[in-house]
Amino acid sequence: ILIRISGYGQTGPCREKAGFGTPAAAFSGLTYLQGYPDRPPVSPPLALVDYMTGTYGALAAMMALYHLKTSDASEGQVADIALFESAFRMLEPLVAEYSLTGKVKERGGHIGQGAAPSGTFRCKDGKWVVMVTSTQRTFVRLAEVMGRMDLLEDPRFDTNPHRSENRQAIYDIVQEWFGSPD
């Protein structure tokens, strides 16, 4: 079993380039999505792409071992894993989104871009909390905790698609509830 890990794969125009996680994150498009819309893209603050690629390599080795042990195969396998492909793998849903809408996903800052409300909220003590309400049930629970059952009747917030259309408004309401530093 041979696991090959490189920056950009064994073939193609970039095969000779050095393989480092930060440039691979940028090459994949991952860096473009990090940060705020009105500011430059931000690289991941740790070796995220390196860790992901190592995980994919370990998984490939385990699958190749499993294949050897559970089949009549007598030869090993070769897996070619590129750093940028590991990062790009996380972005695959955006390819489908682009093909449907023709819109390039933009940086969202600290406000989550999936379910709403979601994102990073500043608390009264100056610390931060990350929260996501990915289902109607979790939004109902949030409304209960906030003492804001009226949000469930507001047509802007009664479903996740409606909350997503009014992302900033619901974010602001939740941020006010969390408080802000004095």
Describe the role of every protein-language-model region.
Residues 1-129, 133, 140:
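Active-site-adjacent "lid/gating" segments in soluble enzymes
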Residues 117-182:
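Aromatic-enriched alpha-helical interface/lid elements that frame and gate functional surfaces
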